[in-house]
Amino acid sequence: MINLASYSYPKGLHLLKSWQAGTEEAKAEIKSVFDAAIAGDFDENFSVLAPADEVHSTASVHMLALAILNDIYGVSSAEYYKTDPYRYVRANLTVGRLLGVKKLYMTWALYAFSCEVLGQKMMYPDKFPPGSDPDEALINKENCFELETPDFSAG
C-alpha cells in the first residue's frame, strides 16, 4: 500500500514536476498514487490537522487535479466537476499533499457553478475548468436591469 506521507515536500513536488515533464515513469507512479487516493486509502491522512503555530495558505488546486485525472484516466471536465464527489475531493486533497500543503482546503470553480445554477449555459472543455458560454450570456445589456433577487426560500 502507498503511504501518502512518504510524498511529503519536496518529494511530491518532484513527482508532479516529472509528471508534467511527461516522463512515463512519473506517469505510472502518479497513477499509483491516485489509484490509492480514489480508493480512499489516504482518507486518514486527510484528517491530520495542521500545526497551529504556523501560517497556512494554498491556492486553488482543482485545475491541477483535473489535469492529472484527465491524463491518467481520461476524465473529462464535466465528469470531474459533476459526477463523483469522492473522487473530486480525494484528488484535490492529494494534490494539496503532493504540493506540500499541511492545512488542506477544498477549492472548486465556484464562479462557474454559481452561474450554472442560475441558468447560464456552460462550457466544459475536456481538460480545463468550466466557464460560461460567451455566445449565450445569461446577463446582457438587454436584461441587466430586469434582474431580481432569487427567492432563496423556494429551494
List where the protein language model places each region.
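Catalytic cores of TIM-barrel enzymes
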Residues: M1-G155
